[in-house]
Amino acid sequence: MADTALNANLRKTATKSIVKEIRNNGGIPGVVYGKHVGSMAISVDAKDLKNILGSVTGRNTLINMNINGSKQTVMVKSLQMDPMHQNIRHVDFQQVSENTKIRTVIPVQLVGTPKGVAMGGVIQHDLRSAEIECLPNRIPEAIQVDISGLEIGDTLSVSDLNLPPGVKILDHPHTTVVGLATIKAPEPAGQPEVPPEPAEEAKAKTIEKE
């Protein structure tokens, strides 16, 4: 089911010194958990993991993990990042089964140029990622939305999306995905106050005295 390989090493302890040593040697500490494996503390090579995350499928890549000779199909479930340097400090892997549906998040990509753009329409992309449910081997790289037919004032909602067979989107059907709006022209500035003519100003002062 998975064609991307990743080697992992079991680690029996999780002391600060062991974790620091793993990172200093180019590794990333992590955990694999699932129905059939329980929870296992592991470490993986940082470069190998970054290559997987940088691929087209990214975190939704099905990984054939070799854990000291034991093969498990897993996916990246969560990452703990170093906020200062944006390095991965810890990774959680979830074991998956080819017969069990899972939930994950995939990007929503817009395709085409709306008709209304020529009339001054502006694209408003509201839903940039969507939560889906499907079997692991049916996870699409992205949901592509054809917006070429949109005119000013048109919108597309989750219920309008065309999904691959076996894929269910979990976002609310009425959630707006994309729309074509117009930018309001700035209202003209107020007319500057015109000072009264000298004669009118003098007349006004005379009336005030009376």
Curated annotation (Swiss-Prot):
SUPFAM superfamilies per UniProt: Ribosomal protein L25-like (SSF50715)
Biased composition (Basic and acidic residues): 200-210
GO biological process, one term: translation
One GO MF term: structural constituent of ribosome
GO CC annotation, single: cytosolic large ribosomal subunit
Keyword vocabulary terms for this entry: Ribonucleoprotein, Ribosomal protein, RNA-binding, rRNA-binding
Entry annotated with the keyword Ribosomal protein: yes
Keyword Ribosomal protein set for record: yes
Region span, Disordered: 185-210
Subunit architecture: Part of the 50S ribosomal subunit; part of the 5S rRNA/L5/L18/L25 subcomplex. Contacts the 5S rRNA. Binds to the 5S rRNA independently of L5 and L18.
Sequence similarity: Belongs to the bacterial ribosomal protein bL25 family. CTC subfamily.
Function: This is one of the proteins that binds to the 5S RNA in the ribosome where it forms part of the central protuberance.
Name assigned to this protein: Large ribosomal subunit protein bL25
Biological classification of the source: Bacteria, Bacillati, Bacillota, Clostridia, Eubacteriales
